A protein has these predicted regions:
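Extracytoplasmic beta-strand/coil segments of soluble accessory domains associated
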Residues: 2-42, 46-47, 55-56, 65-85
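Residues embedded in well-ordered regular secondary structure
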Residues: 7-10, 17-25, 35, 76, ...
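Short beta-turn/strand-loop junction motif enriched in small, turn-promoting residues
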Residues: 13, 42-44, 62-65, 80-82, ...
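Extracytoplasmic loops and strand-loop junctions of Gram-negative outer membrane beta-barrel proteins
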Residues: 39-40, 60-62, 151-157, 191-194, ...
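Flexible loop and strand-edge segments within Gram-negative outer membrane beta-barrel domains
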Residues: 102, 147-187, 191-198, 206-279, ...
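Surface-exposed loop/turn segments flanking beta-strands in extracellular/periplasmic regions
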Residues: 113-151, 242-279, 334-356, 399-428
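Outer-membrane beta-barrel transmembrane strands
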Residues: 161-178, 186-187, 277-331, 359-381, ...
Length: 463
């Protein structure tokens, strides 16, 4: 949705997160709340489709969206996806590889700057010059950063890369005859996190196939199948990190640069004088665990349209859409144990553990949505007059359910399953929701030679 920024008049797009897979924008029209999104005539979600599948996008404001009822109070975004055409088969392939990076970088203070600040704090509190926390010789050692007792570790460079790659590939085929038209699409998108390698990724796959055909002279039928699967895989990183939202504040800026990146014994994790041990531990899936969320969405749409031979311009149409969603979250947190090292004595000392104990949480969710639309459409021009009308009945039935379980105190995190945790710490929960809505819609348009116009709309909803 963030790609719509600057593309449509009156549409305000605000990206609230840069995390791969969560970089969708909040949209509003003329500064109001979130608009209603209609995809191919049915309410939908922009995050479920790939930009390459979109044929056109338009906006309805004010009274022009009244046919969609109270839900259109903040405006309507109309999206039409691509379909087949009366042409020879055409195959299109598009690919792109981009690099994403920060436009502005705020780096944490290094050891030298921290020491200066501590001296300033001491002196501003009425301290004595000769008893400042750090002498000039020590400040110089921090600046050089070569003495193991006066390190100047750059935690930012250790875990953040300048650019994170993103790739997008899609292939489509379009074709058909006057009688039958078809369209197929497959797209793949991958984004990597800006943290150093082995810190996770986001993958998304989109598939679509549709066709329409004239069964008889006045009868046209068709179907459209869309499938989307995505996988959000991030480091767990403890209670400060979670799914990535608090990383910058909780990890980078609280790490102490006076501690080393790693220890001579590579099997041990270096301490960084912070609540959750070390940024090196937090961003590495092998060390801290992972937050892995998989979503599957499949949408089937079928329609039949019949043009009356008795009333010119009158068509009857039935449109049925069925959507199935499923999600599975596996959130494995591995507790970190951290050490310090005294080079002179060649001694390793236990420094602490990450706050959260080792745990595993699994969430399962499913949802279905059935939409049925039955309509009569009338459209005719005669002697400078244009008359069009719509009468529609629409019903929506939605079911959702989910459950989760969590267990803690793993004796070993080698086995990443519930059975390896302490059964006495297990907690479970579940929930479900069901709702439905029926709507009756009517619209009448009349104009005479595009000079005089009348439009009337009526809609009733019950839930």
């Amino acid at each position: 949705s963030h790609t719509l920024a600057g593309q449509l008049p009156g549409l305000v797009s605000k990206q609230v997160s840069g995390l791969p897979g969560q970089d969708n924008s909040s949209l509003n029209i003329r500064g109001f709340g979130s608009p209603l999104v209609i995809i191919d005539g049915v309410e939908g979600d922009l995050t479920r489709i790939d930009p390459g599948q979109i044929e056109s996008i338009s906006i309805l404001k004010d009274g022009s969206g009244s046919i969609y009822g109270a839900r259109a109070g903040n405006g309507v975004i109309l999206v039409t996806t691509k379909t087949g055409a009366d042409q020879a088969p055409t195959i299109s392939f598009n690919t792109s590889y981009t690099l994403q990076g920060n436009t502005v970088t705020t780096r944490p203070a290094d050891s030298f700057q921290r020491a200066l600040y501590q001296n300033d704090i001491y002196m501003n509190g009425g301290g004595v010059e000769s008893r400042k926390p750090y002498l000039e010789e020590e400040l110089e050692l921090f600046k050089k950063g070569t003495n193991p007792e006066y390190l100047n570790t750059d935690w930012y460079d250790a875990v953040i890369r300048k650019f994170a790659p993103q790739q997008n590939h899609n292939i489509s085929v379009t074709g058909g005859t006057e009688k039958t038209k078809y369209y197929g699409y497959f797209g793949y998108n991958r984004q990597e996190l800006q943290f150093k390698p082995n810190s996770g990724h986001y993958d998304r796959y989109n598939f679509q196939v549709n066709f329409s055909t004239k069964v008889k002279e006045r009868l046209n039928v068709g179907m459209n199948i869309q499938y989307m699967m995505d996988d959000k895989n991030y480091p767990s990183g403890g209670d400060l990190y979670q799914d990535g939202t608090n990383f910058w504040q909780g990890i980078i800026y609280s790490a102490d640069p006076r501690y080393p990146l790693s220890l001579p014994d590579k099997s041990l994790l270096s301490y960084a004088n912070m609540q959750n041990g070390s940024p090196i531990w937090a961003v590495n899936i092998d060390n801290s665990g992972y937050y892995d969320l998989k979503n599957n969405n499949i949408k089937f749409t079928g329609f039949a349209e019949y043009a009356s031979k008795y009333v010119e311009g009158l068509k009857a149409k039935a449109n049925i859409m069925y959507v199935y969603n499923s999600s599975f979250l596996k959130w494995m947190h591995k507790r970190g144990t951290f050490y310090t090292y005294e080079s002179g004595a060649d001694l390793y000392s236990f420094a602490g553990q990450s706050v959260e104990p080792s745990s595993l949480r699994e969430d399962h969710g499913t949802g279905t949505n059935l939409v049925q639309q039955y309509s009569l459409n009338y459209n005719r021009d005669f002697n400078g007059h244009h008359v069009s009308g719509l009468a529609m009945f629409e019903s929506t039935i939605n079911h959702n359910k989910n459950f989760y379980t969590k267990v803690q105190d793993f004796k070993t995190t080698i086995i990443e399953e519930m059975v390896a945790g302490d059964a006495e710490t297990a907690i479970n929960g579940s929930g479900s929701s069901n709702y439905g809505r029926v709507s009756v819609i009517g619209r009448l348009d009349y104009n005479y030679r595009d000079k005089y116009m009348i439009e009337a709309t009526i809609r009733g909803d019950a839930s």
